[in-house]
Amino acid sequence: MISVALLAGGTSRERQVSLRSGAAVQQALSAAGYNVVLLDTDCTDQQLLQNNVVFSVLHGAGGEDGQFQTRLEKLGLPFVGSDAASSRLTFDKHAYRQKLLAAGLPIAKGARVDWQTYPWHPLAQKPHVVKPSDGGSSIDTFIIRKPAQSDLLAIEQSFKTHKQMLLEQLIDGIEITVGILGDQPLPVIEIIPPASGEFDYINKYNGATQELCPPPHVKPQLQEKAQELALQAHQLTGCRDLSRTDMIVQKDGRIIILETNTLPGMTATSLFPKMAQVAGYDMPTLTDCLVKMALSRAETAAA
C-alpha cells in the first residue's frame, strides 16, 4: 500500500484552514486506498522519508512560500503541487504581478507600499484593495470604497505585521475563479458574497457566500477566455498539478486577473474541490489523481 505523508497545520495564521483541509484530504485519501500519515511542520526528516509521497495542505507562510517545498526537494521526496521556485513566485504577490505584467496578461494596477507611503499613494485616493504581499485566505485584506478612520486604524495594525503590503485598484465586476488540474482548466465558479459584505475571510468560510457553477452571469465565451487565462497564469508561473486563479469580469467583458494560488484550500467549503466535483472528480478521485501525478513525475525523473 502506498503511504502518503499528509502535512497540515503549520504555524501561519492560516493554520485552522490548513487543519480543515487536512481532515478532508485525509478522509479522501483513505477512501482512495492509501495509507495516510498525518504530520505537521515539526515532523522529522525521518518521519517524512518513511512515506512514498507527500501531500501538503500547509497554507500560508512556511507552507506555500517555497520553504517546505525546498525541504522536500533536498530530501528527494516526491510531492504533490508546485516546486519551490514556483511557490515562491506566486506567494510573493508583487513578484507575481511583475511576471504577469511582463507577459502582457491583464492584471489590476497596483504597487507595493509601506505604512508611510500608503496613505499618500495615488491609488489609495480611489476605491482600492490593501492586502499582504504574501499570504492568503483573505486574511488582512481590506476592501476600501470610502476611507474611514476605523479602516485606517486596522490597516495600520496590519502594516505592523507585514511591513509592506500590496495596494491595488479595486476592480468592480463579477468575481470568478478557475482551477487547473494537471494541465486542464476546471469549470468556472462565480462568487457572490452576501449582500452585507465582500468575499472576505469570514464570508469565505462560513458558507454565507454563493458559489455558482456554471456561472449564471458570465457568458460561455467569457468562461472559455477565463479558463485560457488561468492556464496561461499557471504555466507562466511554473505551477504543477493544481492551481486556482481568481479574476474579475468587468461590465465591458474584460477579465482582470487578481492572483494565483498554488495550494488552494481543500476544505468542505473550498472552491477547488467544488469545481473538480462539477468536472466529475469527487474528493477521493481528485486526491488520488494528484498523488498519481506526483508519483508519475518522480518515476519519469528517475528513468
Regions found by a protein language model. Name each.
Residues 113, 141-147, 180-182, 250, ...:
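Short beta-strand-to-turn element immediately C-terminal to the catalytic PLP-Schiff-base lysine
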Residues 2-8, 36, 45-48, 89-174:
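Active-site nucleotide/adenylate-binding loops and adjacent lid/helix of ATP-dependent enzymes
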Residues 169, 234-266, 276:
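Conserved metal-phosphate-binding beta-hairpin within the catalytic cores
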Residues 149-228, 249-256:
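Phosphate-binding site of ATP-dependent enzymes
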